[in-house]
């Protein structure tokens, strides 16, 4: 690297530092005094279910007053309590209302009633990366790199706020109308200084230290990035088997096999991300995220242009207009029932 290039890289890293310091101030204000109860259910027309989970569903809704479409996440308080997800749910809302980044889905409103908790988010009409990846089979390396770069920047932002994301997978990455990523589902995200011990995540994406019940840190997100890049470029994850226990054995073994079409730069990056030894894993060393950003596989990536969303996306989802749900699967519809008596009031006071 010549002197000029080194100087440019140095000044870029300085301005990133400044940007993140300012971002942290903004985040902390909202983190310390979270917004509450900014809308109510009868202000929305419910249109269609976009996804379901163990304690709720996500619906496309239309805000009556503005005509805007949103994705409304509806969580049944009693089910959240039964599944011991109170802490995770409170975390999700508190984090979402405080963050602000181009590749994070925006929380527009949140409120609760006797039965449910509601998070109303920007509607991202392109659907999950998961469905596009399965349809296409696998992404070319430039295509995978475009998405990976956005995740790298997003993790750099979140980690600077002491947030661990812990749930990276193609199902949680939505593609917007410009072809960029919107990270959704902060149900496992957590503000942690130092280490944490909770077992959570998706089997294929779990870092070895989580499986081995060790205290772990932000480095689990960089491991998961390795899994995601591999899955995007191969069409299948690096560690898979029928039973979670078999997946865990493969993950902990530290052995990865690469498809023959992977470039040598990609294999090198993945060996450094899917690194069982935490003292060697990229993202967790003294240069932090810069070991990843400066890696040869990302040599063509203009990080600032990605952040500014100025790079042309490799793929734009088909979109028939506002409220189009053709990029989502169909689910059985169910009435939203609200009890006349308050359920689990105490547990969710701070929501």
From Swiss-Prot:
Changing residue 88 to Q: Does not affect interaction with SMO. SMART domains: S_TK_X, S_TKc. Keywords: ATP-binding, cAMP, Cell membrane, Cell projection, Cilium, Cytoplasm, Cytoplasmic vesicle, Flagellum, Kinase, Lipoprotein, Membrane, Mitochondrion, Myristate, Nucleotide-binding, Nucleus, Phosphoprotein, Serine/threonine-protein kinase, Transferase. This is cAMP-dependent protein kinase catalytic subunit alpha. The keyword Metal-binding does not apply. It catalyses: L-seryl-[protein] + ATP = O-phospho-L-seryl-[protein] + ADP + H(+); L-threonyl-[protein] + ATP = O-phospho-L-threonyl-[protein] + ADP + H(+). The active site is at residue 167. It is found in: Cytoplasm; Cell membrane; Nucleus; Mitochondrion. Autophosphorylated; phosphorylation is enhanced by vitamin K(2). Phosphorylated on threonine and serine residues. Phosphorylation on Thr-198 is required for full activity. Phosphorylated at Tyr-331 by activated receptor tyrosine kinases EGFR and PDGFR; this increases catalytic efficiency. Pfam families: Pkinase. Disruption phenotype: Frequent early postnatal lethality. Survivals are runted accompanied with mature sperm exhibiting defective forward motility. SUPFAM superfamilies: Protein kinase-like (PK-like). Its EC number is 2.7.11.11. It comes from Mus musculus (Mouse). One of its GO terms (cellular component) is nucleoplasm. PANTHER family: CAMP-DEPENDENT PROTEIN KINASE CATALYTIC SUBUNIT ALPHA, CYCLIC NUCLEOTIDE-DEPENDENT PROTEIN KINASE. Residues 44-298 form the Protein kinase domain. It is a lipid-anchor. Signal peptide: none annotated. Belongs to the protein kinase superfamily. AGC Ser/Thr protein kinase family. cAMP subfamily. A number of inactive tetrameric holoenzymes are produced by the combination of homo- or heterodimers of the different regulatory subunits associated with two catalytic subunits. Protein kinase A holoenzyme is comprised of two catalytic (C) and two regulatory (R) subunits which keep the enzyme in an inhibited state before activation by cyclic-AMP. cAMP causes the dissociation of the inactive holoenzyme into a dimer of regulatory subunits bound to four cAMP and two free monomeric catalytic subunits. The cAMP-dependent protein kinase catalytic subunit binds PJA2. Changing residue 73 to H: Reduced interaction with SMO. Allosterically activated by various compounds, including ATP. Activated by cAMP; the nucleotide acts as a dynamic and allosteric activator by coupling the two lobes of apo PKA, enhancing the enzyme dynamics synchronously and priming it for catalysis. The modification Phosphoserine is found at residues 11, 140, 339.
